[in-house]
């Protein structure tokens, strides 16, 4: 049986439901049918055979605002970073489109906040199920627009979907409190309520997972969102919008406004300064994060930020070399070194240094294969663009000019302008760029140290503190170092630490707040104290 929610006071759209498990029915003339023809780019569907047979419905190029697919006045090209070929032209949203998206989200919030936690949970679960059903197509979209090896893209889609599953469950666990006061005729209650419209700005390196980690929590809490995806990877965000629509997520709850690099600054400013936006969630560089914090300050908006890192990877003399090398490979070369928690500097104690460097170099030569992300066996795809390659190249040249030794790699790869050889440097010192500037590429610089105190001092010298790793077999040392490292996340004898169940975030200039875990939903909730008197 269908049930309708109609709140005239908030000017929201009519939302049609069936309980339980029915899709939203948009009003006539509203939402473009999810199953209808999609204006997906032919180039993307045919790219290198890797996207042959991909569902056209998932290849969207327009913005998604208020439950409708809308073009913009202009478009911008999205390129395959492996070949440089154009994948398609995407709507280039500007300030007008950004404000319209915020308005749509605000109007939808009036109704969405009143939807029961059980129903929000059900809708998120449907979205999760659709991601799993379409996981192969979604993975191929990621590989096409980011260059990520297809095996890793599949892993990201599962990771991404698991956030929707997790927060579908957390939606039903938003509890308040009862506080007993000294006054016998009073009771004090603490309510948790959704904060409002959230502006969500996401990066290109995890174009799906960074959306669901934020949006899953926001929607579970009862918030609505406006997503501005990275200009390099908008197709993943738009594909998620299509699946959200198919899942029955109401019109205006999830909005996507892609834009070009030229418009990114003004669009970001527009959504972050709009008075109808109550929350900003951003993943990206520390530099950009500071700009957005300035925008938020004028209207005192709630902010969550996951910014840059300079993750140390410490190997103590007591470590198992083989385990440390395996952890280093996983931590450094996932997504070709383009993750915010990638190890950026390897601190290796003198007694184990030579054995570690030798084993690390051998593992790199044996296990890393540079190639197109769609090619079977590829472990290292292209960097996102030539600017990223230039940064790695600059760091390598700087280190070598100051005395570092190239153990393996060290130059651009013959495959193309966006490829760089996996590189290992030794004899690295702290005056080199690669030790105090986030690389975001396949470069592993090794610094030799003598004492535990020295390693901790080097690791904590950074003004950022997202993740840190260390390998040791000494239980007392493990506790000391884990507590002393100034980071938000620590991997002890482990190189891969991200999990939907665990809090993700940093300290210092690596950001504010936590994502994922049971704490992630709190970023989108406000506490309200209610004093009930006269009892």
From Swiss-Prot:
Pfam families, alphabetized? Aldedh (PF00171)
Regulation of this protein's activity per its record = Redox-regulated. Inhibited under oxydizing conditions.
The encoding gene: ALDH5A1
- Residues modified to N6-acetyllysine: 126, 265, 365, 411
GO MF annotation terms: identical protein binding; succinate-semialdehyde dehydrogenase (NAD+) activity
- Span of the transit peptide along the chain: 1-47
Q: Where in the cell is it found?
A: Mitochondrion
How does the record describe its quaternary structure? Homotetramer.
Q: What is this protein called?
A: Succinate-semialdehyde dehydrogenase, mitochondrial
Residues annotated as binding substrate are 213, 334, 498
Q: Which CDD domains match?
A: ALDH_F5_SSADH_GabD (cd07103)
Residue numbers annotated as active site: 306, 340
- Catalytic activities: succinate semialdehyde + NAD(+) + H2O = succinate + NADH + 2 H(+)
User: Where does the entry annotate site (Transition state stabilizer)?
Assistant: 205
Q: Where is the PTM N6-succinyllysine found along the chain?
A: 126, 135, 184, 265, 402
Naturally occurring in which organism (per UniProt): Pan paniscus (Pygmy chimpanzee)
Sequence similarity: Belongs to the aldehyde dehydrogenase family.
Q: Which residues carry this modification: Phosphoserine?
A: 499
What coarse category fits the chief subcellular location reported for this protein? mitochondrion
Supply the SUPFAM superfamilies for this chain: ALDH-like (SSF53720)
The UniProt record gives the binding positions of NAD(+) as 213, 228-231, 284-289
Which pathway is this protein assigned to?
Answer: Amino-acid degradation; 4-aminobutanoate degradation
What the protein does?
Catalyzes one step in the degradation of the inhibitory neurotransmitter gamma-aminobutyric acid (GABA).
Cellular component GO terms, alphabetically? mitochondrion
| Disulphide-bonded residues | 340-342
- Would the keyword Transit peptide be found if you checked this record's keyword annotation? yes
Give the EC number: 1.2.1.24
Top-level taxon of origin? Eukaryota
